[in-house]
Regions:
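Well-ordered alpha-helical scaffold segments within catalytic/enzyme domains
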Residues: 65-82, 127-143, 170-185
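Extended, well-ordered alpha-helical scaffold segments
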Residues: 79-97, 140-159, 184-187
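Generic hydrophobic, helix-prone segments enriched in Leu/Val/Ile
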Residues: 33-34, 128, 158-159, 171
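The C-terminal output helix
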Residues: 2-12
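Hydrophobic, well-ordered secondary-structure segments
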Residues: 149-156, 168-176
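Low-complexity, Ser/Thr/Pro/Gly-enriched N-terminal "stalk/linker" regions
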Residues: 10-65, 69-72, 76-109
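Solvent-exposed loop and edge beta-strand segments that line ligand/cofactor-binding
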Residues: 47-64, 79, 111-125, 155-168, ...
């Protein structure tokens, strides 16, 4: 009898739209601010409202993140030349940041284009590896992918001596992205 009653008047079930069930559509990115902050060296660390604050110069962390953002935007922006130009600027900064003698990325550069240290933090190195791994995965140009892959590989060796869990986490995210593109690479 209880079964018949339950079948004849079932309890209402609450069904809210969830993130998984709702199609996700991000708004088209606007590059005006990132372009304002970027010069021929890289992206400037800070701004006062919309004005780049040159007193703080540049850092590897921000250029690695800007590289990821630019490459993620490449399919959503009509002006692909601007995105390509930004991406090339950011990877060029990372190339210059790698100290080939130590295998480590420098982090801070003054607006006068002088490095403020010979070796950056482990965290900034991890973020550089993250950015380069994503660049390998997201690049549409084989030449760009090769440049990112070369820098990525040159920065890996230093990770073996790191003690920062955060640096390792960023590097692992970059390795995961790299392996999405080159899944069979075991070196």
């Amino acid at each position: 009898e209880a079964k018949e009653e339950r079948e004849s008047s079932p309890r209402p079930v609450f069904r809210a739209k969830t993130v998984a069930a709702t199609p996700r559509e991000a708004p088209r990115p606007k590059l005006d601010h990132i372009m304002r902050l970027t010069d021929d060296v890289g992206i400037i660390q800070h701004a006062k409202f919309i004005v780049p604050d040159r007193r703080h110069g540049y850092c590897t962390d921000d250029n690695a993140r800007a590289l990821i953002a630019a490459l993620m935007a490449q399919d959503m922006i009509a002006d692909n030349k601007a995105v390509t130009s930004l991406s090339c600027t950011y990877i060029s900064f990372l190339h210059h940041a790698l100290n080939e003698e130590t295998g480590r990325f420098r982090n801070f550069m003054g607006y006068d284009r002088r490095w403020l240290e010979e070796t950056g933090s482990e965290d900034s190195h991890g973020r550089a590896i993250w950015g380069l791994g994503e660049a390998v995965a997201l690049a549409t140009s084989e030449d760009f992918r090769a440049a990112a892959g070369n820098l990525f590989e040159n920065g890996l060796r230093a990770l073996t001596n790191f003690t920062s869990p955060r640096a390792w986490a960023y590097a692992l995210i970059g390795m995961h992205a790299y392996l999405r593109q080159f899944g069979g690479d075991s070196e």
